[in-house]
Amino acid sequence: MRIDLTFFENLPPTSPVDMRECILAREVYEYSTFLALEKGDIESFERNFTTVKTYYDEFDGILPVSQKKFTILGLYLLYLLSFNKISEYHTEIELIPIAELSNVFIKVPMSLEQYFVEGSYNKILSSKHNVPHPAYQFFIDKFIDAIRYEVARSAERAYESIAMKDMQGLFMLSNQGELSAFID
């Protein structure tokens, strides 16, 4: 479908027909963003997000607001957090108008970042079960894994040895099987 977009002659829109083409193009990239995430293809996710964000930013006030806009923006913020791209995360947050910061899809990554700064790892774990869209689970899991790896690195330096039961609690895992999978 993205190849077919190259046949659209009028981007940006200058007539109602052009506007329909732009809306269709935006939707193709939105769905491509979700599809890339579903496939676990982070590079495609980044590419599609970058393209669809152009439609959100450059055509603001020209095209109607997409119903998927905040879901996708929130996903991108989660991506930045989960891959420890903190300065880029803060740059993106600053670009979001204040009125839109209260959107549920934007609040999730903002809350996670706040919990992380506070060291409230239990709140991060509990937020795993309260996602506003199923696609958020992918990056929340990545974020939790990243935290666990940081805790593991610190524990490696701090302890000469540690009991498996204590390690399970330290890494916020609910059972021995999860701990074994994490260690592997």
Region roles according to the model:
Residues D41, E46-D184:
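Alpha-helical scaffold segments of alpha-solenoid architecture
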